[in-house]
């Protein structure tokens, strides 16, 4: 805002204060009054009649007397924030026929009588958060026929009367989080057919009765996180046809019935983070085709069934981090074509199948950090065209020939990929080196002795046409690299890594049976293939045999 406009606005506020009466200890702005004077001993009796909103902040009076606001019939909003109010007399808010929003937050109110709210028939929102309420009368809300939002978070409620919410048929939001509830009475929510959000987070619930949520057919968001739930009834959610978001994290759930989520066709968000799950039943998410976000992190999963996510074709985010997963089936992510974020960090993965991510063409963020990976198979990222964030840190990477695909891929997309900093764990001479900075010639694999065939034609222009059969120490491969010189007279086929370690032993030349023959020759070739350039030098010395 420009300085001139700001000064103009402040001037108007000051002018408004000067031209209208305002209670002592309060500030008035148009139709709003803010009272924050610690010396204020009671509700001001001289609140202007045109005021619609009044807010008390950190005031010291402890009692709201009967019909304390009766001189202000136009009030629609009354708020007490962090005040010392601890007692509300019967009909404390009587005489407020237009009151729609009442809030008492952070006050030491510990109990309420049944008649405190008896005349608030226009109330739409009631907030009693972070007070000291230990119990509620069963008929406390019986006259609030049009109440839409009820906030009871952060109190000390241990139980709920069975008929407490019976008259709240228009209720849309109910917040009971951060209390001490250990159980829910049967039918407690039976009349709340229009409820859209229910928060039961951070209580002490160990189980939920079979029909506890049975009538909530309009419910869209359900918070059950931060409790002590160990098991869930197979039909607990069977009537929640409208449910879109479900929070079950921070519990102690060790088993999920296969039919648990089968009625939740509109579910888009599911968090099972921080439970005690060891397995996922096959078909658990078979009926949740609309799911977009799924978190299974901080459990004890050791593997994932191949068909676990088969029907989740719209899934955007999947979190499997902080488990004990050692192995992932080749096709476990096969149908996740819309997946953007995949977290596999902090598991025990030692190897990944080359085709594991092949259908994830929209994948942008992949976290593989803090596993036991020593290498990655060739081609594993070839279809991940949108990948820009790849976390690899905390793996024991062996920087030898088997890591050549990863280093080449990182160099190729160096300007597009972030978060790739990770270090070699071996071999010893590369330990601590940054993997993305390695050169191809540094990635060497030792070769175990074996047999490899090598065929050279026309070693020297002066030699007659013919061939030499050479025995080469190195393992004979079903070759991926076929090297040749430009003339095609020298052919060498071997694995890329093993062509670096050749020890050649010559057998007798075909047709040569002269023991007295002396032969000296040396030849160098530059051989090329799709694997790169290989330089080969062969020196042959055949001294005459003794008599």
Swiss-Prot record:
Principal place of residence: secreted
Keyword Translocase: no
Localization per record: Secreted
Residues linked to a glycan: 74, 111, 119, 266, 311, 348, 359, 367, 520
Lineage: Eukaryota, Metazoa, Chordata, Craniata, Vertebrata
Annotated protein name in UniProt: Carboxypeptidase N subunit 2
Range of residues in the leader sequence: 1-21
LRRCT domain mapped to chain residues: 395-447
């Amino acid at each position: 805002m420009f300085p001139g406009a700001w000064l103009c606005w402040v001037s108007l506020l000051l002018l408004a204060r000067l031209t209208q009466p305002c209670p002592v200890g309060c500030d008035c702005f148009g139709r709003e009054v803010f009272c924050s004077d610690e010396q204020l001993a009671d509700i001001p009796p001289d609140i202007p009649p045109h005021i619609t909103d009044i807010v008390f902040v950190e005031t010291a009076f402890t009692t709201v007397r009967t019909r304390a606001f009766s001189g202000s019939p136009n009030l629609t909003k009354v708020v007490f924030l962090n005040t010392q109010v601890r007692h509300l007399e019967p009909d404390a808010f009587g005489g407020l026929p237009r009151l729609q929003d009442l809030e008492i937050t952070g006050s030491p109110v510990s109990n309420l009588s049944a008649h405190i709210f008896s005349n608030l028939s226009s109330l739409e929102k009631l907030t009693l958060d972070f007070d000291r309420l230990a119990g509620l009368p069963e008929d406390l809300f019986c006259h609030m026929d049009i109440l839409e939002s009820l906030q009871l978070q952060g109190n000390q409620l241990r139980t709920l009367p069975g008929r407490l919410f019976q008259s709240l048929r228009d209720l849309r939001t109910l917040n009971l989080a951060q209390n001490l509830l250990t159980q829910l009475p049967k039918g407690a929510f039976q009349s709340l057919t229009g409820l859209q959000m229910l928060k039961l987070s951070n209580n002490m619930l160990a189980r939920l009765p079979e029909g506890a949520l049975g009538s909530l057919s309009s419910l869209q968001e359900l918070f059950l996180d931060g409790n002590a739930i160990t098991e869930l009834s197979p039909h607990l959610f069977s009537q929640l046809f409208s449910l879109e978001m479900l929070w079950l994290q921070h519990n102690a759930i060790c088993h999920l019935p296969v039919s648990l989520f089968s009625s939740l066709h509109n579910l888009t968000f599911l968090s099972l983070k921080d439970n005690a799950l060891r397995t996922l039943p096959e078909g658990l998410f078979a009926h949740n085709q609309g799911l977009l976000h799924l978190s299974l992190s901080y459990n004890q999963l050791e593997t994932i069934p191949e068909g676990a996510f088969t029907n989740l074709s719209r899934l955007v985010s999947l979190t499997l981090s902080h488990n004990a997963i050692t192995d992932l089936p080749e096709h476990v992510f096969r149908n996740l074509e819309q997946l953007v974020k995949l977290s596999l960090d902090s598991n025990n993965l030692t190897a990944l199948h080359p085709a594991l991510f092949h259908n994830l063409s929209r994948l942008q963020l992949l976290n593989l950090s803090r596993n036991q990976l020593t290498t990655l198979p060739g081609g594993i990222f070839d279809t991940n065209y949108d990948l820009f964030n790849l976390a690899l840190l905390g793996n024991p990477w062996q920087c030898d020939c088997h890591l050549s695909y990863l280093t080449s891929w990182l160099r190729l997309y160096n300007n597009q990929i972030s978060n790739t900093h990770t270090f070699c764990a071996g071999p010893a001479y590369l330990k601590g080196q940054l993997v993305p900075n390695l050169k191809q010639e540094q990635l060497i694999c030792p070769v175990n002795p074996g047999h490899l065939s090598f065929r050279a034609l026309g070693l020297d222009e002066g030699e007659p046409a013919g061939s030499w059969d050479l025995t080469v120490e190195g393992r004979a491969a079903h070759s991926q690299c076929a090297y040749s010189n430009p003339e095609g007279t020298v052919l060498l086929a071997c694995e890329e890594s093993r062509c670096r370690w050749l020890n050649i032993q010559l057998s007798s030349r075909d047709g040569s049976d002269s023991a007295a023959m002396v032969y000296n020759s040396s030849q160098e070739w530059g051989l090329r293939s799709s694997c790169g350039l290989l330089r080969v030098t062969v020196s042959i010395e055949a001294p005459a045999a003794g008599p």
